[in-house]
Design a protein with these regions (language model features):
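Enzyme catalytic cores with a strong preference for nitrogen-chemistry domains
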Residues: 1-343
């Protein structure tokens, strides 16, 4: 971390639908495993405290009250965890139900990031239970505490100013204008996504390209944690397809249908350097997104990611041949223009 490498984890847990305390126990267990692996940013799937597939059970008051108690337990567990943790849950506020990602650190709930885009097509019908999040974050009263609630909340490490994290939820990144765009423009260098993206033929490839593209477009790290086995299969099947990407490159990807935890390191110093050099990546002059501080220990990071000895030479032979042909064609076209001009 002292050299700019931040270890992150995307974790799929073994959930039981509507069994809040089983899910709480699994989240706490996997959180400790991620911390033991050195992760400073830990991301869990969408609605993982209850399961994404609770359907009309989401409207039951007893479930929502248990969610609050379980979230308090998970938050307390972070008091002994040097990490910023994102956990998905349903949250009832002012008579409305929202799909949120809670940010937890040092025993506290720092904020609730709301889902902006609710899918209501095909196999999805989230508008049946949930309300779309507000356009701007506001402060709400939650269990006697004043906590930020809304989209595009920025979480900044008190010990490392350049480490700014923001979250979005599943469908948000599939939308025409994801919330992460504005968050990145205001300084977020790592983006977390608590997701429940189902499996259909070919969707995994599209998902990979989507996450790669978003990390490249925003010159950022992207940590994508997906729901997996344990969800109801009445309408859909989830594969636990977790992805960690950095500036257009996938650093780590989970084997689908295995409920894995993946861990890798994101080089935020490199990302910051690339943003400074890229004049088209304009940060906003008027900053309006809310910011909350979190705490981590700044220490050496043990690297698990690999670095190619020949970074400009693709290891894949087909890609290498394509690259060589491209180089020759670029040179040939340049030479052709020169010869035509001088003769």
């Amino acid at each position: 971390m002292k050299q700019g490498f931040i270890k992150v984890a995307a974790v799929t847990v073994d959930i039981r639908v509507a069994d809040v305390w089983h899910n709480c126990k699994e989240i706490c267990k996997r959180m400790k495993e991620a911390e033991k692996a050195g992760a400073k940013i830990i991301v869990f799937p969408e609605l993982c405290l209850t399961g994404y597939t609770c359907s009309d059970l989401f409207t039951q008051d007893i479930l929502l009250k248990e969610v609050r108690r379980a979230l308090a337990k998970v938050a307390e567990e972070t008091r002994h965890t040097e990490a910023l943790v994102f956990v998905g849950l349903p949250l009832a506020i002012d008579g409305e139900l929202y799909n949120v990602a809670a940010a937890l650190n040092d025993g506290k709930i720092l904020g609730f990031t709301t889902k902006t885009f609710l899918p209501n097509y095909g196999e999805f019908y989230e508008m049946r239970q949930f309300r779309q999040g507000p356009k701007k974050a506001r402060v709400i009263s939650y269990e006697g505490e004043e906590i930020l609630f809304g989209p595009q909340i920025l979480y900044q490490a008190a010990e490392m100013d350049d480490l700014v994290v923001s979250a979005e939820i599943c469908e948000d990144v599939w939308s025409p204008i994801p919330p992460s765009i504005e968050a990145a423009r205001e300084g977020a260098i790592i983006l977390a996504n608590c997701s429940a993206s189902d499996e259909t033929i070919g969707k995994d490839s599209y998902r990979e390209e989507l996450i790669k593209g978003q990390s490249a477009r925003l010159i950022a790290g992207y940590v994508y944690a997906n729901a997996g086995d344990g969800e109801s299969t009445t309408d859909v099947v989830f594969g636990g397809h977790n992805i960690i990407a950095e500036n257009g490159t996938i650093l780590k990807e989970a084997k689908r249908f295995a409920n894995e935890m993946i861990v890798s390191e994101i080089d935020i110093f490199r990302l910051l350097s690339e943003r400074r050099k890229n004049t088209t990546f304009q940060t906003t002059e008027e900053r309006h997104l809310p910011k909350v501080l979190f705490h981590i220990n700044v220490e050496e990071t043990a690297l698990t990611r690999s670095f190619a000895q020949t970074p400009f030479v693709p290891q894949n032979m087909a890609e290498r041949e394509k690259r060589c042909e491209e180089i020759l064609m670029i040179q040939a076209m340049g030479l052709k223009k020169r010869l035509v001009h001088t003769h």
